Amino acid sequence: MAIENCLQLSTSASVGTVAVKSHVHHLQPSSKVNVPTFRGLKRSFPALSSSVSSSSPRQFRYSSVVCKASEAVKEVQDVNDSSWKEFVLESEVPVMVDFWAPWCGPCKLIAPVIDELAKEYSGKIAVYKLNTDEAPGIATQYNIRSIPTVLFFKNGERKESIIGAVPKSTLTDSIEKYLSP
């Protein structure tokens, strides 16, 4: 997911998408349009044909390639009764699930920590949150008696539970345990 996001062009770098569409009427049917190529975080422009460079030189000058990998996980995704099996039990990577409720003060305290961990371990683990008010069946199935509770799953199997608003290091230690084969 992060790799796909890293290769997308921002709206200011719409040379290959919107900008090309708006200038298609200037090109001959046999003309080639060269768009920026991805080379890390630097932009690189292949040689432009004379028809493209003469029709819109400024368009290429102000465009830029933007890596959106840091935005791949903006927030932890919700999981519910209908998505639980697919996202948690059938996941090919370890899963961390935060059981929470909107009225829970300690849940609000740990939420930013869960968000940070989701960003730090993006692509290595899947991180979800489950609102116990909206999915009480799953909370009951896994004996969730206090919130926040964080459960860890690997290969669809429950491995560990951590109860309460714990320090980030406690969760990090648990994540690291399940990353090794």
Swiss-Prot record:
One of its GO terms (cellular component) is cytoplasm. The active site is at C104 (nucleophile), C107 (nucleophile). The record marks D98 as: Deprotonates C-terminal active site Cys. Keywords: Chloroplast, Disulfide bond, Electron transport, Plastid, Redox-active center, Transit peptide, Transport. The keyword Plastid applies. InterPro entries: Thioredoxin, Thioredoxin-like_sf, Thioredoxin_CS, Thioredoxin_domain. NCBIfam families: thioredoxin. It holds the Pfam family Thioredoxin. The keyword Zinc does not apply. Disulfide bonds join C104-C107. Forms a complex with heterodimeric ferredoxin-thioredoxin reductase (FTR) and ferredoxin. This is Thioredoxin M-type, chloroplastic. The record marks G105, P106 as: Contributes to redox potential value. It is found in: Plastid, Chloroplast. PANTHER family: GEO12009P1, THIOREDOXIN M5, CHLOROPLASTIC. Residues 1-67 form a transit peptide. Belongs to the thioredoxin family. Plant M-type subfamily. One of its GO terms (molecular function) is enzyme activator activity. Residues 68-180 form the Thioredoxin domain. Participates in various redox reactions through the reversible oxidation of the active center dithiol to a disulfide. The M form is known to activate NADP-malate dehydrogenase.
